[in-house]
């Protein structure tokens, strides 16, 4: 591609045209070719891990200069363990069943027609993301597996890391004899590229934003193409009166402290009043001991180390070692709180009462509902998808972790035998 970085509209038009052409070829690529491309990409990532980490160190220095928060820097950082995780994710996606051409259902009609509904690629996916370089590999792999071309526009913070990973994906495509343009990275930090992508209705079929509330809100507000997204991950954990104390302690600590900067991190703890002075108090003290700032309501602020919560703390995505906590009268009170302040992302109940669990699952409409497990399982890899391109909380098409299967549409194949309609 000729250098068009000083002319962003022309650059994006060129990238879009190349992606559209590549998607037409990739749509009928064999499962074997896609497997080869992904495994070769994984091999390239591991072979170049030192170069990838060196590129990431440039991004980390740039991020510190920009004053990124610790949570954002954590999302940006790559070390050998995280690179190994990227390799594992690529291999996991490679080993999955190819969704393209899968017969979803089929039936016979009295007219003599045989009808099949089969999965097909969406076409061209545009992914706009901020500081997580692993999104480059995850999105590229999932789009390739599902027969879609992808245009990757990473944030300025992850510019070098994303470039190094995209190069590995293109090496995999070359190895498999597939079009390199099936995976393209926008080679400029100019924010005008984002605005161009949002208006590329002729070449992009869906946009997936991965980032903070500001980015996602911008995309949802201005995009002229369909969007798969979630605005915030305001995840709740409700401790029911029937909660097992050991499970409650283990799950809440993991949900809050394992990684605070991800969208599956717990942001609000709701405690049934019957266990507020026992299990609830123990969990709150354990959070404080772990270095978490607990912002509690009137009932909880009496515990040493708790600060009084303000109204703005309810429904806040902290992405930090902070959690809001309050005592609720019962399950229905907890449900009301979640409906009021939640984001339909992921919510969990810790309970041994099957009726309470059933009511929690039935009465909430979050994309992911969890029983007796950490909200940090809200992840495509943990769902057996190998990776995810994002988590969608809308109700159209994809919902929850968006893996390769969710990046397909379908078409009907209708077979007759000289059949006519009377």
UniProtKB/Swiss-Prot annotation:
Q: Which residues cross the membrane?
A: none
**Could you name the Gene Ontology cellular component terms for this entry?**
cytoplasm
UniProt GO BP: L-proline biosynthetic process
Q: Which UniProt keywords apply?
A: Amino-acid biosynthesis, Cytoplasm, NADP, Oxidoreductase, Proline biosynthesis
Q: In which pathway does it act?
A: Amino-acid biosynthesis; L-proline biosynthesis; L-glutamate 5-semialdehyde from L-glutamate: step 2/2
Give the chief site where it resides: cytoplasm
Protein name as it appears in the record: Gamma-glutamyl phosphate reductase
According to its UniProt entry, this protein's organism is Jannaschia sp. (strain CCS1)
């Amino acid at each position: 591609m000729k250098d068009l970085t000083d002319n962003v509209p022309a650059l994006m038009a060129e990238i879009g045209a190349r992606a559209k052409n590549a998607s037409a070829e990739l749509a009928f690529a064999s499962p074997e070719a896609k497997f080869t491309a992904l495994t070769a990409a994984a091999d390239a990532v591991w072979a170049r891990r030192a170069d990838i980490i060196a590129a990431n160190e440039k991004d980390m220095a740039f991020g510190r200069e920009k004053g990124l928060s610790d949570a954002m820097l954590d999302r940006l950082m790559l070390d050998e363990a995280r690179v190994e995780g990227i390799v594992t994710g690529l291999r996991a996606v490679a080993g999955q069943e190819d969704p393209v051409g899968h017969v979803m259902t089929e039936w016979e009609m009295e007219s003599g027609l045989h009808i099949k509904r089969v999965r097909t690629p969406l076409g061209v996916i545009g992914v706009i993301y901020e500081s997580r370089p692993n999104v480059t590999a995850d999105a590229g792999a999932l789009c390739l597996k599902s027969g879609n071309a992808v245009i990757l526009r990473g944030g300025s913070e992850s510019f070098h890391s994303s470039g190094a990973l995209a190069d590995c994906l293109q090496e995999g495509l070359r190895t498999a004899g597939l079009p390199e343009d099936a995976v393209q990275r926008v080679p400029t930090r100019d924010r005008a590229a984002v605005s161009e992508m949002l208006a590329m209705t002729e070449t992009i079929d869906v946009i997936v934003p991965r980032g903070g509330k500001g980015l996602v809100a911008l995309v949802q507000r201005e995009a002229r193409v369909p969007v798969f997204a979630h605005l915030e991950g305001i995840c709740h954990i409700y401790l029911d009166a029937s909660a097992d104390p050991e499970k409650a302690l283990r799950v809440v600590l993991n949900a809050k402290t394992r990684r605070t900067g991800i969208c599956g991190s717990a942001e609000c703890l709701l405690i049934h009043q019957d266990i507020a002075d026992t299990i609830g108090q123990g969990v709150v003290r354990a959070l404080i001991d772990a270095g978490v700032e607990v912002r509690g309501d009137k009932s909880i602020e009496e515990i040493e180390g708790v600060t009084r919560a303000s109204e703005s703390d309810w429904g806040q995505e902290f992405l930090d070692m902070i959690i809001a906590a309050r005592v609720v009268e019962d399950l229905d009170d907890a449900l009301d709180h979640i409906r009021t302040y939640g984001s339909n992302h992921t919510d969990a109940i810790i309970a041994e009462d099957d009726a309470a669990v059933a009511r929690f699952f039935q009465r909430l409409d979050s994309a992911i509902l969890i029983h007796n497990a950490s909200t940090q399982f809200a992840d495509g890899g943990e769902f057996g998808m190998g990776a995810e391109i994002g988590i969608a909380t809308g109700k159209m098409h994809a919902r929850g972790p968006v893996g390769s299967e969710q990046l397909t549409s379908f078409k009907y194949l209708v077979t007759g035998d000289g059949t006519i309609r009377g």
